Curated annotation (Swiss-Prot):
The record marks H157, E204 as: Could be important to modulate the pK values of the two catalytic cysteine residues. HAMAP family: DAP_epimerase. The gene is dapF. One of its GO terms (molecular function) is diaminopimelate epimerase activity. This is Diaminopimelate epimerase. Its main location: cytoplasm.
């Protein structure tokens, strides 16, 4: 039997998503497998992450799947994309998005300028290994991590203030998934600071190197502030565009564009 699923394809600075309203999904779907199928770039729609959303009385719930079918706890670019989609479909400008227990306050200033208040970050969580353990691991694999800091933005990130070539970023990103360091994996950010801007590349757990990462931008901005490398406001620079970042009363606010690519129908065999 073949069923039809309405979808929207969007991207935030090249970080792309397939977005589906939960009401269009049958309860019989294996969502993890559906995510893998739709995310496949040759036989599916193609995306970095698969997003399901559901409207409630005063907020929208967002569920995030990686291309390997695993779940993710946060995605800043997907949040901006979902906020824009809701704005286009309903006209709402102030939108609350819930991802698990994380509340994200969104404002659509205009179609190309969406801000997301992601709240506070933490530099002291149980999942974070000691600095000595990270350095010991780095030396074993001959990885030059230079200035490194862990940050929790609702999902786990490690920020490496070091310039590495893409092939080396891939190696480091994969090796830092070692269970002895990060039991559930970690998002790895490669940050280079120039003139109060952070030039950022991100290796996302469950996805690999992506063109942009909103939560990585937030975590790297917070880490840069903590280390004194930058001041607020600042700019995060990705290959296909920038995000403006600022800190207000301990909260991190991300601002940038989101792009609607297509609306369509996906045909699914059950």
């Amino acid at each position: 039997m073949i069923s039809k699923i309405n979808f929207v394809k969007m991207h935030g600075l090249g970080n792309d998503f397939v977005i589906v309203n939960k009401r269009d999904l049958s309860s019989s779907y294996d969502l993890s497998q559906l995510a893998k199928n739709m995310a496949e770039r040759h036989t599916g729609i193609g995306c970095d992450q698969f997003i399901i959303y559901e409207e409630h009385n005063d907020f929208y719930e967002m569920i995030i799947y990686n291309i390997d079918g695993s779940s993710a706890k946060l995605c800043g670019n997907a949040t901006r994309c979902l906020a824009k989609l809701i704005y286009l479909d309903t006209g709402k400008q102030d939108i609350t998005v819930m991802v698990g227990n994380k509340k994200l306050l969104c404002n659509v200033n205009d179609e190309n300028n969406i801000s997301v208040n992601v709240g506070s970050v933490s530099f002291n969580e149980a999942w974070m290994p000691s600095r000595d353990k990270v350095w010991e691991f780095a030396e074993r694999y001959m990885i030059d991590l230079k200035e490194t800091i862990c940050v929790d933005i609702g999902n786990p990130h490690v920020v490496i203030f070091s310039k590495l070539e893409p092939q080396d970023q891939k190696i480091v990103g994969e090796r830092l998934q070692a269970k002895e360091l990060f039991a559930d994996g970690v998002n790895v950010n490669f940050a280079e600071v120039k003139d109060n801007k952070i030039y950022l590349s991100v290796w996302e757990r469950g996805a690999g190197l992506t063109l942009a990462c909103g939560s990585g931008a937030c975590g790297s901005f917070a880490a840069g502030l903590k280390r004194g490398f930058i001041h607020s406001p600042s700019t995060i620079v990705f290959k296909h565009g920038n995000l403006t970042m600022k800190e207000e009363n301990g909260n991190i606010i991300m601002q940038g564009a989101a792009t609607l690519v297509a609306r369509g129908e996906y045909y699914c065999e059950q």
